[in-house]
């Protein structure tokens, strides 16, 4: 029989009508005289009622046999419910069943299909098709759909063209590790799955498309965490002839539409701007969470005046003040903060409590003679806790930035109802990599440097590594609640400048042509000024849904070992397949 509507949509408008619904048994209760079945589908739950004494024999038997997760087709009359349930949309009605057909039976599930059930992550992933039946997960997945629909509506209306770019690409350096795909036809050669469509979308600009977008899968072989997956989805944009502010304005309008369509929230435009240096110096992060204060203070000048070797020998001394919370932090809890600071590169964590007009505990004996100066500089009041890091500027910012987030959560300083958007602008072009022992591009090698700092790229033989620190980029990141939501930049459209950039990154001209020759050649054929941005769709939906792990908004994600417990991917393949690809495994038995 044809379904009348989704079970979760049957409301008072159907009163006294005979309807048909189909779905899964969420709960079955036999209360002696009556059998109640909660029937669930993607839209919600409706209550089915069967009176064994008055119902047809086959209806009573089907209701008696039904168990959790059986799939049923139910036909019946919609009647007013005696005891209403205001918590659900269908709570004012119930269906008196006149026909029940069991479409499919079910074994006992490995976990209850309901929200807030405690299950191991890998068990949820192994039975993901069951996990997705839970109302919360269905809500997350439908929210993802609503988000992509809103994005497409805006971009289509703004003149963007949706273009698919290839998944089988050339492997290029600079960035995370590639996922490699061996070629059977071209023995010993490999494709790389795209970390982003960066170069392809730039080539679409010189092709004359003017405005491109794509909601696209990307792949990065990197260590996983809550907001990362080996395969992820980004909203990829590129435009010709637009400046930095125009691209930001367009992105703001896109986000504002999504927020209104998906969350019913009106966001204020334009979003605030913060330059990179201020983000690092005051928040200790290039993706600052601006929902709360707890800013970093530079005490270097004052700290050098005290008789404390650790302060005197450090490049900088910075601090955060936890207002009115000194009595909430025991020595043990401060030790935990110290360990976190060390994990972020600091040698240690100095601290004092300000109690009854004087410093106590920690390094208080070294600051006693300068109490008034520190009190005035930090605007201290009674029961404040001060945490210091004395180290290099980068380490002090990083360590205190991490502590800031931890303390913000501990002290309830964060308003989790807020959506605080922010642009971080004026980025450095390069950042030092301890692992590579060289400067690397902070975003990617195709970012346009500012005119004022391009001279520091000069490859005339006099450039020093330290000059690269002075180069600034036309780059911009969009941040939401302490997460990088996306990043973009204006791009280089001059071959000479692009070759200078690659040279600064250590590429010899021959290597540059080997890796990026197709782009360099394209730059000889009238390449327009262009720029763009990519938004992380998974991360955006995660934040809209109020989750802290993108697995909650992806239908079939991987675990933290980049594995799929359901399909057992990745897996060993047959020797014959490897032979066809001319691949021989090293240390196969280890």
Swiss-Prot record:
Enzymatic class: ligase
CDD domains, per the entry: AspRS_core, EcAspRS_like_N
A Pfam family recorded for this sequence: tRNA_anti-codon
Location within or outside the cell: Cytoplasm
Cellular-component GO terms for this entry: cytoplasm
PROSITE patterns hit by this protein: AA_TRNA_LIGASE_II
InterPro entries documented for this protein: Aa-tRNA-synt_II, aa-tRNA-synth_II, aa-tRNA-synth_II/BPL/LPL, Asp-tRNA-ligase_1, Asp-tRNA-ligase_1_N, Asp/Asn-tRNA-synth_IIb, AspRS_core, GAD-like_sf
EC number: 6.1.1.12
GO MF term (any one): catalytic activity, acting on a protein
Region: Aspartate, residue numbers: 198-201
Amino acids binding L-aspartate: 174, 220, 443, 491
Catalytic activity line of the entry: tRNA(Asp) + L-aspartate + ATP = L-aspartyl-tRNA(Asp) + AMP + diphosphate
Keywords of the record: Aminoacyl-tRNA synthetase, ATP-binding, Cytoplasm, Ligase, Nucleotide-binding, Protein biosynthesis
The organism's place on the tree of life at top rank: Bacteria
Example GO BP: aspartyl-tRNA aminoacylation
Alphabetical list of SUPFAM superfamilies matching this protein: Class II aaRS and biotin synthetases, GAD domain-like, Nucleic acid-binding proteins
Residues the entry annotates as binding ATP: 220-222, 229, 484, 536-539
Record text on subunit structure and interactions: Homodimer.
Family from the record: Belongs to the class-II aminoacyl-tRNA synthetase family. Type 1 subfamily.
Purpose: Catalyzes the attachment of L-aspartate to tRNA(Asp) in a two-step reaction: L-aspartate is first activated by ATP to form Asp-AMP and then transferred to the acceptor end of tRNA(Asp).
HAMAP family hit by this protein: Asp_tRNA_synth_type1 (MF_00044)
Name of the protein in question: Aspartate--tRNA ligase
Organism: Lactococcus lactis subsp. cremoris (strain MG1363)
Taxonomic path: Bacteria, Bacillati, Bacillota, Bacilli, Lactobacillales
Gene name per UniProt: aspS
């Amino acid at each position: 029989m044809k379904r009348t509507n989704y079970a979760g949509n049957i409301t008072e408008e159907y009163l006294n009508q005979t309807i048909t619904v189909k779905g899964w048994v969420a709960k079955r209760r036999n209360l002696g005289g009556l059998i109640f079945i909660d029937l669930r589908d993607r839209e919600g739950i409706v209550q089915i009622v069967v009176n064994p004494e008055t119902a047809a024999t086959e209806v009573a038997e089907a209701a008696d046999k039904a168990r959790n997760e059986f799939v049923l087709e139910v036909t019946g009359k919609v009647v007013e419910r005696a005891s209403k349930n205001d918590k659900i949309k269908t709570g004012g009605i119930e269906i008196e069943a006149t026909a029940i057909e069991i479409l499919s039976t079910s074994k006992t599930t490995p976990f209850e299909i309901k929200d807030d059930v405690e299950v191991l992550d890998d068990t949820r992933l192994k039975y993901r098709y069951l996990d997705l039946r839970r109302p919360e997960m269905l809500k997350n997945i439908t929210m993802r759909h609503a988000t992509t629909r809103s994005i497409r509506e805006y971009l289509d209306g703004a003149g963007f063209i949706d273009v698919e770019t290839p998944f089988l690409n050339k492997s290029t350096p600079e960035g995370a590790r590639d996922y490699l795909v061996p070629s059977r036809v071209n023995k010993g050669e490999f494709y790389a799955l795209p970390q982003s469509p960066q170069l392809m979308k730039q080539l679409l600009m010189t092709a004359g498309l003017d405005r491109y977008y794509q909601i696209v899968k990307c792949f990065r072989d990197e260590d996983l965490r809550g907001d990362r997956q080996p395969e992820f989805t980004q909203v990829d944009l590129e435009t010709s002839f637009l400046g930095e502010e125009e691209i930001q304005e367009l992105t703001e309008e896109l986000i504002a539409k999504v927020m209104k369509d998906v969350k019913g929230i009106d966001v204020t435009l334009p979003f605030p701007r913060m330059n990179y240096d201020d983000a690092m110096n005051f928040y200790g992060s290039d993706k600052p969470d601006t929902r709360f204060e707890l800013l970093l203070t530079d005490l270097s000048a004052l700290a050098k005046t005290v008789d404390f070797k650790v302060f005197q020998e450090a490049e900088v001394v910075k601090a955060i003040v936890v207002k009115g919370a000194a009595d909430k932090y025991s020595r043990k809890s401060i030790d935990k903060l110290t360990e976190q600071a060390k994990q972020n590169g600091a040698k240690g964590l100095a601290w004092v409590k300000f109690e009854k007009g004087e410093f106590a505990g920690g390094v208080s004996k070294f600051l006693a003679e300068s109490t008034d100066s520190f009190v005035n500089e930090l605007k201290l009041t009674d029961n404040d806790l001060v945490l210091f890091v004395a180290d290099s500027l980068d380490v002090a910012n990083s360590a205190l930035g991490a502590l800031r987030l931890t303390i913000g959560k501990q002290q309830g300083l964060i308003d989790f109802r807020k959506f605080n958007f922010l642009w971080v602008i004026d980025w450095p072009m390069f950042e030092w990599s301890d692992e590579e022992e060289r400067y690397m591009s902070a975003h990617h090698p195709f970012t346009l440097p500012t005119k004022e700092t391009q001279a520091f790229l000069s490859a005339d033989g006099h450039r020093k590594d330290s000059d690269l620190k002075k180069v600034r980029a036309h780059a911009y990141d969009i941040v939401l609640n302490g997460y990088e939501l996306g990043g973009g930049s204006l791009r280089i459209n001059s071959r000479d400048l692009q070759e200078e950039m690659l040279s600064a990154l250590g590429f010899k001209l021959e290597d540059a042509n080997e890796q990026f020759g197709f782009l360099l050649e394209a730059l000889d054929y009238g390449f327009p000024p262009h720029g763009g941005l990519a938004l992380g769709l998974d991360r955006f939906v995660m934040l809209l849904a109020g989750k802290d792990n993108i697995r909650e908004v992806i239908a079939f994600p991987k675990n933290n070992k980049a594995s799929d417990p359901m399909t057992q991917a990745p897996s060993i393949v047959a020797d014959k397949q490897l032979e066809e690809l001319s691949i021989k495994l090293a240390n196969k038995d280890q």
